[in-house]
Amino acid sequence: MYKDFFEAVKCKVLGLTATPYRLSSSRDFGSMLKFITRTKPHVFSEVIYHVQVSTLLDMGYLAKLNYYPMDKELKKYNGNEFKKCNLKRNSTGADYTDRSVQKEYERIDFYGYLVHIVQRLMNPKAGGKRKGILVFTRFLKEAERLTWSIPGTAIVSGDTPKKEREHILEAFKAGEISVVANVGVLTTGFDYPELDTVVMARPTMSLAMWYQIVGRAIRPHPSKECGWIVDLCGNIKRFGEVSDLRLFDSGNGKWAVFSNGRQLTNVRF
């Protein structure tokens, strides 16, 4: 639709984005993440300027982050291991089915494990008390388990009335609520530079989602020495740290995103 609009008004288009890739699906090639200049409909044809995330971190425009993959902690907790091989792709091939994720959660008691991790984060052995803990869950069940188990925890979901959501988030920013579990609604547009702890309590095949969720803690603030990214589902292993992401032009405008030498865009999932 937006391509038709641009063509109708016959204007030049300048795009600004922190995530220059989009999900594309086709019968022949399945699902893949494509660099924005290589998508159809073809709206953007050229990259005129780019900057690497690592450069912005070095210059202080973004906050430093510590990443904590918690794979081994689950084994210590109950002897289980989160296995992505048990997850099945949905019909588009772009993400996992709800049912396969739920079955894996039940197999490893993911709900109890999430409560255990958040309780530890509320009283860390090192690094000082956290300003706020924002938890990203896939389903409402995990978020509800947190509120039942940990006093002072609130839920924000697509069903939360607007005024109630605003009240919860203001209380969170004021330190009156220490933990907010959100179900797919604060991935983008949530402005809280002081936020220092993000818990990724869901698996994803989406680089854009991973980047956006990590981005909730990457905004700098004088009171924040370092943000924590706590990953319970193997996403760090899949995508790497955002500082590892590199935009690279292999020639003739064939841009792609790489992480630690591994190509993430314009390759089949």
Residue ranges with predicted function:
Residues H42-L134, G253-F258:
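Conserved interdomain linker/interface between the two RecA-like ATPase lobes of SF2 helicase motors
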Residues L134, E142-L146, P151-T188:
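Conserved helicase ATPase core of P-loop NTP-dependent helicases/translocases
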Residues G60, V179-V199, G215-R219:
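SF2 helicase motor core recognition
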Residues M209, R216-L247:
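Conserved segment of the helicase C-terminal RecA-like domain
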Residues M1-Y67:
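Post-DEXD/H (motif II) to motif III coupling segment of the RecA-like Helicase ATP-binding lobe
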Residues S250-F269:
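Cys/His-rich short segments
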Residues C11, A18-L23, T55-D58, D71-K76, ...:
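Conserved nucleotide-binding/hydrolysis micro-motifs of P-loop NTPases
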Residues V9-K12, F44-E46, L62-L65, P151-G152, ...:
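Short glycine-/polar-rich loops that comprise or flank the Walker A/P-loop
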